């Protein structure tokens, strides 16, 4: 298991550490439900440094390279901005999703945990000699503050500094130790939030300062488990569970967010252009509400049927503490994926109705 950069720091806060995709991760600080409530009701600080971080340098050449590799418009050098995007193969299948941050003269690719070797091989095999691609897991960390009052926490930390107002906009801040950090407006759980990209050496000072502010504002540290529950409740699919290489990008419901409407030269464009119309897609990722009386949540691959015909399958599920309901994601054939349709979920031990609902899930619990 690969160690987390700030492992000892978190142990001082009584963190529960375990593995996500063979990477050490802060799972919780001992009270997942309280941490989740802090994220959704006020705000919480989460260490996302278990995720893959890759640095790409090469000035204009790096920008041109990433523009070809990724589906969305990459921030220009020196813009200090971010985008959410896909990396595709020529068949239009998703290799990974990622956030790509411009950090002055370099780019940081932030992807799902455990993807370092795969993405390094993929990027290095296509990069020219004037582009450097390296593993940044040991040198760069990612913290995120998520929740309705996330901005209040940052304002209390960065007195007088102007924060990025628009989603995916960013600002560079110089810390008292002379190190610079990147602050990005990035609502990862649907209620507002900011990422903090910092050198590993600066992390402990940042966390300790923010910890004091959290306490003063009745907020707390939160682990990956609470963060992932909030992410699910916000209707945001996760790579490895709801998005994987078997899926064409346009089937995920994320095309508007992750794919440029003007670029035509990225890998996989020809396939994506043929599947831009919903009628051309075989299936589509939908949210599902399951009946409350089921005893066991469905597993990835459990089938969805309509009139005894298999029309889809489950990708992930959750007993939501926020909505007090059983929820799921699943891919459903285009002829049966209308909002409101009621399907039959067939699991190993039971069958149950499953209703297709709008995303984000909050729209169904007004």
Kindly give the residue locations of the regions a language model identified:
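Acidic, proline/glycine-enriched N-terminal capping motif
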Residues: 1-88, 92-95
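A generic structural motif
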Residues: 107-110, 192-198, 325-333
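Glycine-rich, small/acidic residue-mixed loop/short-helix segments
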Residues: 90, 247-366
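A glycine-rich (often HGG/GG-containing) alpha/beta subdomain
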Residues: 61-104, 146-188
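Glycine-rich, acidic
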Residues: 3-29, 132-285, 289, 298
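Helix N-cap motif at beta-to-alpha junctions
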Residues: 59-60, 112-117, 148-151, 199-204, ...
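Short amphipathic alpha-helices in soluble, non-transmembrane regions
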Residues: 69, 121-125, 157-159, 206-215, ...
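A common structural junction motif
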Residues: 73-74, 124-132, 161-162, 210-222, ...
